[in-house]
């Protein structure tokens, strides 16, 4: 993920947002 310029915090935020979006 470092190659994509994403940090662990960014990855968690994106994963959480994706999960919430899928739930809805």
UniProtKB/Swiss-Prot annotation:
Keywords: Calcium, Cell wall, Heme, Hydrogen peroxide, Iron, Metal-binding, Oxidoreductase, Peroxidase, Secreted. It is an enzyme of class 1 (oxidoreductase). The keyword Iron applies. It catalyses: 2 a phenolic donor + H2O2 = 2 a phenolic radical donor + 2 H2O. Ca(2+) binds at residue 19. It is found in: Secreted; Secreted, Cell wall. One of its GO terms (cellular component) is extracellular region. InterPro entries: Haem_peroxidase, Haem_peroxidase_sf, Peroxidases_heam-ligand_BS. The keyword Iron applies. Its EC number is 1.11.1.7. One of its GO terms (molecular function) is lactoperoxidase activity. Removal of H(2)O(2), oxidation of toxic reductants, biosynthesis and degradation of lignin, suberization, auxin catabolism, response to environmental stresses such as wounding, pathogen attack and oxidative stress. These functions might be dependent on each isozyme/isoform in each plant tissue. Belongs to the peroxidase family. Classical plant (class III) peroxidase subfamily. This is Peroxidase 7. It comes from Cycas revoluta (Sago palm).
């Amino acid at each position: 993920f470092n190659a994509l310029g994403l940090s662990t915090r960014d990855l968690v935020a994106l994963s959480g947002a994706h999960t919430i979006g899928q739930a809805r």
